[in-house]
Design a protein with these regions (language model features):
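...with weaker cross-activation on analogous glycine-rich loops/strands in unrelated enzymes
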Residues: 43-121
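Generic detector of well-ordered alpha-helical segments enriched in charged/polar residues
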Residues: 1-5, 58-62, 136
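N-terminal capping segments
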Residues: 1-45
Length: 143
């Protein structure tokens, strides 16, 4: 958590996307989560995957039975996945695919506090109500 918090304010996503192996800027939210996990030894120990695509991160946690839907009250260190897009750009329900990812900092009084990379092209702290419709669910690392 301290490693992620130390990055709040970073603009543009360096060093996260270049650490991952990309030669130029990409959508870097998952690179940020992976970079932080690597800095803490979690990738090497199989606790959090190295992933650049949110859908791949979701599948990794689901394959290991380490997934929870958006109805839970998450705990610090869980990986929060978002679903912003509706099917075919229509209004209504989401398309069920993750478009963004961050790290749960804490959950208090029905509010989920997060640390996110590529939130407006910066590392930022954000907050959402528990059960917010754009939260797809949570990866639950086995720390």
């Amino acid at each position: 958590m301290a490693e992620a918090l130390s990055q709040v304010g970073n603009i543009g996503g360096q060093p996260y996307w270049s650490w991952y192996g990309f030669e130029g800027r990409v959508e870097w939210c998952a690179c940020f989560v992976s970079w932080g996990a690597n800095e803490c030894g979690y990738i090497e120990n199989g606790i959090i995957p190295k992933f650049a695509g949110c859908v791949n991160g979701v599948q990794w946690f689901k394959d290991r039975g380490q997934w929870a839907d958006n109805s839970i009250e998450p705990t610090p260190g869980m990986i929060i996945f978002f679903d912003w897009d509706s099917p075919n750009g229509s209004s209504g329900s989401q398309d069920g695919l993750s478009d963004h990812v961050g790290i749960v900092e804490k959950c208090e009084n029905g509010i989920v506090y997060t640390i996110e990379g590529n939130s407006g092209d910066a590392c930022r702290q954000r907050q959402y109500p528990v059960g917010y419709y754009e939260i797809l669910g949570y990866g639950i690392p086995a720390y």
